[in-house]
From Swiss-Prot:
The keyword Mitochondrion does not apply. 2-oxoglutarate binds at residue 170. Residues 33-47 have a biased composition (Polar residues). This is PKHD-type hydroxylase Veis_3084. It comes from Verminephrobacter eiseniae (strain EF01-2). GO terms for molecular function: 2-oxoglutarate-dependent dioxygenase activity; iron ion binding; L-ascorbic acid binding. Residues 78-179 form the Fe2OG dioxygenase domain. Its EC number is 1.14.11.-. The keyword Iron applies.
Amino acid sequence: MLLILADLLSPQELQTARQLLRNARWDDGKDSAGTQARQAKNNQQLPRDSEAGRRIAAMVLAALERSALFLTATLPKRVFPPRVNRYGGEHNHYGDHVDSAVRQLADRHDRLRTDISCTVFLSPPDEYDGGELCIDDTFGPQRVKLPAGHAVIYPGTSVHQVRPVTRGYRMACFFWVESLVRSAEQRRLLYDMDMALLRLRQQHGESPETVALTGSYHNLLRMWADT
């Protein structure tokens, strides 16, 4: 399931993030890539110890916590600490690849399964040419280039790439989610059911039928969740 999270970051948060990035130091993105990804990856990233990166990551995590759409679509168990990357100049693209199934967390004592990938766009689309996030999965090929502050989530199993940036710079925040529900198909069913329940409540309130279906939703989640 591919889903757009419109205005995940507020205008004030976005302005703060862009101010933090004005004088940031960037590292070669290949330094954090695996064997396969190193062949395709040509971008830059903020260092792990970057103060700007830490502050932007904290803003993004806070925004995720208040996004009901993110919570119902991903059913998050854990979120990989967000990182910030940049495409432009000589470091302008990332070829076809699949994200690593498991990521080492910063403390090196734990790992996270990458069920869901997420990109939060930090640059307005009129500031750069190219740079589309191209995702190829069971829902068909998709080209994603969103307004600054918007985010996209999609299955971590997807083959995807970032097209070359031919003018300007494309900055974004990226991370992965380990879901309580491992199966993308089961997550989609739960999401569709939750959205239908929301509409039922709006139309009929807490009717006996709505209460019964809510119970079915939670029983399915109880059956499928890995806590």
